[in-house]
Amino acid sequence: RAIILQAVYFKLRFTLSYRDVEELLKIRGVKVDHSTIQRWVFKFSPMIEATMHKRKKHVCDSWRMDETYIKVGGKDRYLYRAVDKQGNTVDFLLTKRRMKGSAQKFLNKAIGNNGKPRLINIDKSGANTEAIRIINRHSLTFKKIKTRRVKYLNNIVEQDHRTIKRRIAITTGFKEFESAQRTLAGIEIINIIRKDQLSNSKKSWFA
C-alpha cells in the first residue's frame, strides 16, 4: 500500500509522466508498469478526495470564482474553481460545457461542501452571474450571495489555475472525461495538502 500511495503522490504532486514515475520507482528497486500506476491514480484519487472533504479546514466567506479550459479527447472542457480571499481552495469541478447549468452545478457542490459565501468575485461571464442569481432566488434563507466584478481580485485564482495546469503540461491531454475528472481531483487534493488546508495535518496521507 505504501508503494501505491507513493506512486500516486509522485504523479499528482510533480510534473511527471507515468513513465517518469515508473522510472523513479525502478530506481528505488520497485518494478511497476506505468499503466499500473495510471490505474492506481484512477482508482485512489476519488477515495482520497472523499476523505479530504471531511478534513478540510473552513474557508473564508469571500470567494474568487473562475473557470479554465482543459483538453479532453481533443476538445475543450472546463474546470470550474474557486479560492477564498487568502488563496485557499474552496472547490473544483470539471464540466463538459461552459454554461449556466455548469456554473450552477459547481456552486451547488462548493456551497454543499463549504457553506454559503457572503460574496463571490467573478469575471463578466453571464453564465456565472445567472447561476448565482438562481441560487439566491431559490435560497431558503434571507442570506443572499453578493457578487462583485473586480478583475485584479481574480488574479489569485488565475495563478492557482496555473499551478494545477502545470501538473498536466507534460501530457498531450486526457483521452477520456472520467480519467480527466479523477486525475484532476487528485491534483487538486495535493494542492490543498500543500496549502496546509487539512485539519490534523501531522497525520500522513502518503505513508
Positions of PLM-derived features:
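Residue-level recognition of single "structural anchor" positions
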Residues: 1-207
